[in-house]
Amino acid sequence: MMSGIFFTAFALQWAAIIAMALLIVGLFRQVGMLHERLGPVGALTLSGGAKVGETAPLFELPSLTGGEVRIGGTSTDGRSTLLFFLSPTCPVCKTMLPILVSMTKESRQSTRLVLASDGDEAAQMKMILREKLSDYPFVLSTDLGRAHGVGKLPYAVLLGPDGKVAAKGLINNREHVESLFEAQRTGIASIQDYMARRELAS
């Protein structure tokens, strides 16, 4: 009698565990689907700073990795400039660094990467050494961030060879960076601009 009760309880317990496991799997699938639906499909542009299509302000700044860096104005080598604003205390910025390095290496004939930050120089130098960024221009300038309307990080601005802002926005993944280059190619400034044009066309 007791063994029958024990067996029934044991079976019910396992049935409950299996049901919970199936429920958890189902929840993970739903979260994944929701993430795909709600995930941004392009870099989110913030208001403020030089607008897309406008000539970016010209800066000539010393680089923490050596030399002077000219940001803005007509490019002397015909390349675009991908200006990446970051901070040593920004974990997403750290995640984005290898992505940006990889992408700009692939397109180094047409694009150069310039890193920009502000704040404590010692902390920036530690990040440069830790993340192996000595091959890239790295500038410290609060005015540069203000000129481009940077309010949140990580943020990127793509300047065309003509010195005009081709695209800009918050970036959290590779797709966001690719959307900046796609915006430059198509002339559509941002995902917001794309949606606005689609609404006008409908």
Predicted ranges, named:
Residues M1-G49:
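Long, leucine- and charge-enriched amphipathic alpha-helices
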Residues G39-G73:
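N-terminal "domain-start" segment that seeds a small globular fold
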Residues V69-L100, R112, A116, V177:
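Short active-site neighborhood of thiol/selenol oxidoreductases, capturing the structured segment around
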Residues T76-D77, Y155, N172-E175:
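A short acidic/small-residue loop/turn micro-motif
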Residues Q109-M125, L133-T142:
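Thiol-based oxidoreductase modules, predominantly thioredoxin-like and allied folds used
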Residues M127-D162:
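Short, internal strand/loop/helix patches
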Residues D162-S202:
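Thiol-/selenol-based redox modules, centered on thioredoxin-like
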